[in-house]
Amino acid sequence: MPTISIRGNEMPASPIRKLAPLADAAKQRGVHVFHLNIGQPDLPTPQAAIDAIRNIDRKVLEYSPSAGYRSYREKLVGYYAKFNINLTADDIIITSGGSEAVLFSFLSCLNPGDEIIVPEPAYANYMAFAISAGAKIRTIATTIEEGFSLPKVEKFEELINERTKAILICNPNNPTGYLCTRREMNQIRDLVKKYDLFLFSDEVYREFIYTGSPYISACHLEGIENNVVLIDSVSKRYSECGIRIGALITKNKEIRDAVMKFCQARLSPPLIGQIAAEASLDAPEEYSRETYDEYVERRKCLIDGLNRIPGVYSPIPMGAFYTVAKLPVDDSDKFCAWCLSDFEYEGQTVFMAPASGFYTTPGSGINEVRIAYVLKKEDLTRALFVLQKALEVYPGRTE
């Protein structure tokens, strides 16, 4: 029998989804599972998007242009202008989610064997997309004790060699919630200029910054306009994960031309998703404000609750809607699986993402989990109580 590819064998399992069969089995036993594992917002999608889908009166659901509808891209120009990101519609290519934007960025800019420097912990799918492109992720460590702040520039330079082609950041960060400072962004700019690198910047969570600190986009950095590829998605800011609409943005026409070849090969981004996403830009300001305020309250509920549990520590995330917390356990993969397969408290349990899957360095994150605060506060409070009960009886507790 033929064997599967080396690439298929190397592709990592998602730390976010790999325990889903255990969660499904728990539900079949009648256990209520609090889903803290995945960044699936529970807040309503803008009514304008729902109405736009309901009111579709097309006779044919045709292919859209490979770059996405121009009307949508032109409206996005106005959206980004609110963040002092000055674009034209031609700078924007609509993709099937932010994931496709990352993949097409890698495929268009990197050769097999090229290296990307990424602070870790990092969004696990970056590793999968790098494998798909034949590229190699080189990670630079950040630590929970230092709030996951970026290391000194010298640490980046230690990793740069003749194969280094790019730096990838997620700002605000998934999974940690860390927000890069202006100084850190300027240091990254200087590295990109000095070594003539690409800068891939995943800025999906720009709407969710809780500290009052300024949002510094890679597109704000002077002198590297042609090096920057910005990754975006509507999934989080509009609770539209299922419509699979993202964007790849760059001033570099050579990159855009290369990306368009991959876009043409996959034909078109989702038609109905674009209709919903374009309509979402007409959502009232109250929608964004109420969404933001809700996440502020959930963040406080979660972080305060975590840090009250004996042996648990979480820094305060500055953005996005995740945190990485340290638990008093021997192995978070085992603990998260045990919570689903062997534990329940009053018919309830918790589903978290083991943080080891967000690292490439062996042994890193072994006692950490990523938690998404995408449940209402009452459910978060109950989930924290159930987590505390689980930690009290877990056989591999270390404290």
Indicate residue ranges for each PLM-predicted region.
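Conserved N-terminal alpha-helix of the aminotransferase class I/II PLP-enzyme fold
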Residues: 63-96
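PLP-dependent class I/II
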Residues: 2-4, 8-14, 19-34, 38-56, ...
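Basic nucleic-acid-binding alpha-helical/helix-turn surface characteristic of O6-alkylguanine DNA
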Residues: 59
